[in-house]
Amino acid sequence: MYSGNRSGDQGYWEDGAGAEGAAPAGTRSPAPLFSPTAYERLALLLGCLALLGVGGNLLVLLLYSKFPRLRTPTHLFLVNLSLGDLLVSLFGVTFTFASCLRNGWVWDAVGCAWDGFSGSLFGFVSITTLTVLAYERYIRVVHARVINFSWAWRAITYIWLYSLAWAGAPLLGWNRYILDIHGLGCTVDWRSKDANDSSFVLFLFLGCLVVPVGIIAHCYGHILYSVRMLRCVEDLQTIQVIKMLRYEKKVAKMCFLMAFVFLTCWMPYIVTRFLVVNGYGHLVTPTVSIVSYLFAKSSTVYNPVIYIFMNRKFRRSLLQLLCFRLLRCQRPAKNLPAAESEMHIRPIVMSQKDGDRPKKKVTFNSSSIIFIITSDESLSVEDSDRSSASKVDVIQVRPL
């Protein structure tokens, strides 16, 4: 996979990595596109991004494995996202980092294929996970449907299969992986006018950008509308319900912020590739290309920071990890297993309205916080689950 040949055809690189007639990556190595100082700075930036990405995402995985209270279906999606970001930090920038140290691409065609495949696969996993997470928020907040681990694991399996299909297509002949414009990594052939290659680029934009972004916007738009409507319902104005509504809003904000930050980091890369596809590749210089690449890879650093600062359970778990004995004495009941805490359902609000309106009992699950209002206080929760919609009205879900 390693090639020590540093001599090359400068004209090939001036036309761009995706120019027609370009030789496969590794058969011809380019002359340096940047100065030695620039390569050193790029290596330093990539090394810092990789270290921060590995450290932050490993911390998320450690917290999830150590603290049972974090083991919920929603957190499982966050862990899958962190796993994808961790793999990007470990494998997605390795060849580019080594090439920066050698002042240019030094790998053969197999190395180029692996670099393009790994970067594409883990990037697709991230955007698809954020899309599924938005849908999960949507069905739980808007439709008050509770998902379980079985649903979450199936969704994660489909996420990886879907991403693997898109990343593996160029290896099977639908488009190909070639050296990028900056000459330090590989990507799909954006410039090719061949019908086979251009059709892949078109469907890739639709399947991995337009559709996911559309689903994310639709889901969070409905979540925002539903939360505002629920806050206007007079019967829900109890202290506990108001707290839950605020909690739902915070969770939705956190998930939306993750999607927004991810798309913001990838937007320069998407714009530059869109210019190349539409015949404006001369505007995308190697410097512009590598800067957009660095912005895209920086997305792996931000998600762990968002978890810690916006998710109270992750924040408390981190503090408990750092000061275990002190917090264990202060909060002995906080580290109960998730399965144990979900077994008991208890009433939290009893409200009596004036007139002939029956007494209403609001119950909830102490882990997933499912509010159930029944018109008959003698009706048990088990009976409520089997009763018709006229007797039971599920009005809110707290998922984490």
Curated annotation (Swiss-Prot):
It is found in: Cell membrane; Cytoplasm. Disruption phenotype: No visible phenotype. Increased weight gain on a high fat diet, as a result of increased fat mass and increased insulin resistance. Increased basal glucose uptake in brown adipocytes, potentially as a result of decreased GLUT1 expression. Significantly reduced lipocytic rate, mitochondrial DNA expression and cytochrome C oxidase activity in brown adipocyte tissues. Loss of light-mediated increase in glucose uptake, mitochondrial respiration, thermogenic capacity and lipid metabolism-related gene expression in brown adipocyte tissues. A lipid is attached at C323 (S-palmitoyl cysteine). Keywords: Cell membrane, Chromophore, Cytoplasm, Disulfide bond, G-protein coupled receptor, Glycoprotein, Lipoprotein, Membrane, Palmitate, Photoreceptor protein, Receptor, Retinal protein, Sensory transduction, Transducer, Transmembrane, Transmembrane helix. Pfam families: 7tm_1. The modification N6-(retinylidene)lysine is found at K297. Residues 1-38, 101-115, 176-199, 278-285 are extracellular. The chain crosses the membrane at residues 39-63, 76-100, 116-135, 152-175, 200-227, 254-277, 286-310. GO terms for biological process: cellular response to UV-A; keratinocyte differentiation; negative regulation of apoptotic process; negative regulation of melanin biosynthetic process; phototransduction; positive regulation of cellular respiration; positive regulation of D-glucose import; positive regulation of melanin biosynthetic process. GO terms for cellular component: cytoplasm; plasma membrane. G-protein coupled receptor which selectively activates G proteins via ultraviolet A (UVA) light-mediated activation in the skin. Binds both 11-cis retinal and all-trans retinal. Regulates melanogenesis in melanocytes via inhibition of alpha-MSH-induced MC1R-mediated cAMP signaling, modulation of calcium flux, regulation of CAMK2 phosphorylation, and subsequently phosphorylation of CREB, p38, ERK and MITF in response to blue light. Plays a role in melanocyte survival through regulation of intracellular calcium levels and subsequent BCL2/RAF1 signaling. This is Opsin-3. It comes from Mus musculus. The gene is Opn3.
